[in-house]
Design a protein with these regions (language model features):
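Glycine-rich phosphate-binding loops that contact phosphosugars or nucleotide phosphates
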Residues: 1-102, 182-224, 230
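Extended hydrophobic-aromatic, low-complexity segments
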Residues: 15-19, 119-120, 140-144, 151-152, ...
Length: 235
């Protein structure tokens, strides 16, 4: 099949603009792969191939299950494309698959003790604004974290690419501004430490999120939340 491939994502499978894009792409000869949660939805019916996330109904206001399962779906698609194209080895392929299976257990272990997170929530709930920083894949997590906080707390919050900090962003930081700095990518920790120092020089109070075993972040951040280590591909 030499048709161009369009990958669409829609939790409901009924998103109007996504459905319009699907129909236009099909009209122009594209093959459609959709990632959706709802069996029998319009997007699922009109796609050539469907990857169901099977996340079930979203009970919380914030769409956490759908987002997480969509990420995993994208990983699975990318992994299978990579193995077919020969850009990763079979050993690496199965290593990532095996690690994927451990993620739910790691999340459960993280949720066993959330006293630190509760304490932080109590302190930031009266703040008028909060900023997230991240580099690479951590920037995408920062964007999602910012969105979730907006949706459920009604606090003004924005996420910024830490590498662009000097281009206007840092001017928003003032004394006492809470900043969440996400630094789980080992090769980017050093640069994130520099960013943390920059915002702290402006008076920010920094909550860092990093992986277990990382020792340098705590020397510059005000507080640190540790998450379980995993493959860089899955962070």
């Amino acid at each position: 099949d030499d048709r161009p491939l369009l990958i669409l994502v829609s939790q409901s499978g009924e998103t109007a603009d996504t459905l319009a894009a699907l129909r236009e792409a099909k009209r122009k000869g594209a093959r459609i792969l959709s990632i959706t949660n709802v069996v029998g939805s319009s997007i699922a019916r009109e796609s050539d191939d469907v990857f169901y996330t099977w996340a079930g109904p979203e009970v919380a206001v914030a769409s956490t299950k759908a987002y997480t399962t969509q990420l995993i779906a994208f990983y699975m698609v990318a992994l299978n494309m990579a193995i077919k194209k020969g850009t990763i080895t079979k050993e690496k392929y199965f290593e990532v698959l095996d690690e994927l299976k451990t993620l739910s257990g790691k999340v459960e272990s993280l949720l066993e003790d959330i006293e630190a997170e509760k304490s932080i929530a109590q302190r930031i709930k009266e703040k008028s604004s909060l900023f997230y920083l991240g580099r690479g894949a951590d920037y995408q997590t920062a964007l999602e974290g910012s969105l979730k906080l907006k949706e459920i707390s009604y606090i003004f919050t924005e996420a910024f690419a830490a590498g662009e900090l000097k281009h206007g962003t840092i001017a928003l930081i003032e004394e006492g501004t809470p900043v969440v700095a996400i630094a789980t990518q080992k090769d980017l920790v050093e640069k994130m430490i520099s960013n943390i120092k920059e915002v702290k020089a402006r008076g920010a109070y920094v909550y860092a999120i990093t992986t277990e075993g990382e020792t340098e972040i705590k020397k510059v951040a005000d507080e640190v939340i540790y998450v379980p280590e995993t493959l860089d591909l899955l962070k």
